[in-house]
Amino acid sequence: MPAGSMSTTGYPGVCSTTSYRTHCYIPVTSSVTLSSSDLSPTFGHCLPSSYQGNLWLLDYCQESYGEAPTCKSPSCEPKTCSTTGCDPSNSSVPCNSPSAGQVFSVCETTNVSPSPSCSPSTQTNGYVCNCHIPTRNASKACQTLRNGSNCFGQLNCLSKSFQTLNHCRLSTLGYKSYQNPCFIPSYVSPLCYISNSCQPQSYLVRNYHYSSYRPTSCRPLSYLSRSFRSLSYIPSTFPPLRYLCSGSRPLKCY
């Protein structure tokens, strides 16, 4: 078998160690922006209404067909059976490539062997696959993956063609609707910013860099008299800054 490749029992060469996942881990520390009518309606990101750890969770965004890498074969993560016991989900799992236009959030964990066994001298490897075939102008809902107290979100806001992102999906996960917010990294300034222009910035998505957007010229604001077309609210649980803007009320940072 070529170096760097894996296969499951009965499915040789299907799996590759190269990651094609669309998970994106966005570090957030101390600064974000609010959306306003000043921002171009041809770009935007969906910000959540909740914050946990140091990650934002992004929800229900459109992506262009050419932005995400084509998943010729699903990525696979090895799972090793315990030497003291064997979980059926840890047995060898076939990694079937989805058909064109189909989105696989998580591959089905179908067991290859009917009754896998583990012993101290042998181990049974299994694979969990996550593959995604991008489609033109496809809208996808972000899922929340929880691992203990850690929360991770999938980034599907990968719009190289600047698709208009008008809303986030109202879901039971606590997301709220925003219109074209723009993310500002914490190294810009610990002040409030509104920007009229953004330029591409690469965020590391495992082994790939997807284009995202950040402000290229921002101006600090302590008061904003223009009327906002939509309410943008960053919850007070976000440390250490609090943001609130509604209509023509003052925009303040605390």
From Swiss-Prot:
Sequence repeats lie at residues 193-202, 203-212, 213-222, 223-232, 233-242, 243-252. InterPro entries: Keratin_matx, KRTAP_PMG. Transmembrane segments: none annotated. Pfam families: PMG. One of its GO terms (molecular function) is structural molecule activity. It comes from the Eukaryota. Specific expression in the middle/upper hair cuticle. Keywords: Keratin, Repeat. Residues 193-252 are annotated as: 6 X 10 AA repeats of Y-[ILR]-[SVPC]-[NRTS]-[SNTG]-X-[QHRP]-[PSY]-[QSL]-[SRK]. Belongs to the PMG family. Has a low cysteine content when compared to the majority of known KAP family members. Possesses several C-terminal tyrosine-containing tandem decameric repeat structures. Interacts with hair keratins. This is Keratin-associated protein 24-1. It comes from Homo sapiens. The gene is KRTAP24-1.
